[in-house]
Amino acid sequence: MVGDCQITFQLVESHSATSELESQVAASDLVIEVLHDWQEKLSLSDLCMASRKPLLHCGGAGMRFQLFCMLPGKSCCLRCLLASLGLEDSIGSREAQGVLESLAGIIGNSLALGAVKILSGFGASQSNELIKIDGLSGELEVLRGFDPVSDCPDCGVVRGKLL
C-alpha cells in the first residue's frame, strides 16, 4: 500500500495570465484539468507537455465523460488525442447539458485515484488510454494506443527529447 505522504493542492478557478499559469505548472508535480472551454484545455495541455508535467484530463457533460492521463514522452498530447477521435465523438458543453452529480463523483474519484498512482508510483498509470464513461447506457470503454505523434510539435518533440 501507499505509505504516508504529503500532498498540497492549488486550485486555479480561472484561466490565469500566461506567465502566471506557466509558473504554476512549472511548480506542480501534476495538473488535473476539468476546464469547460476546449481552447483553455488545449492551451493547458500544450503548457504541460512543454514543461513535461503529467496532465489528468476530464471532459464531459450530462451523463457522458472521458478521462485521459497525458504523460509527456509516453502518450500523445490532448490536441492529438482529440484529433484522433474526430468531431463526431466529441462531448458537448457542460453549460448546455449540465452534469449528473452522482456521475461527477465517480469521475472525481477516478481522477483522485489517477493522481495518487502518478504521484506515488503505485500501480499502473492509464497513460495512452482514454476511458469513456456513459452513465446512460452504463457502458465503460477503454481505448488504447494514444502514443506520442512523431510529427506533432508538442508530444512528438517531447518524446524526441526524452529518447
Q: Predicted regions: what is each one?
A:
Residues 1-163:
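Adenine nucleotide-associated cytosolic modules
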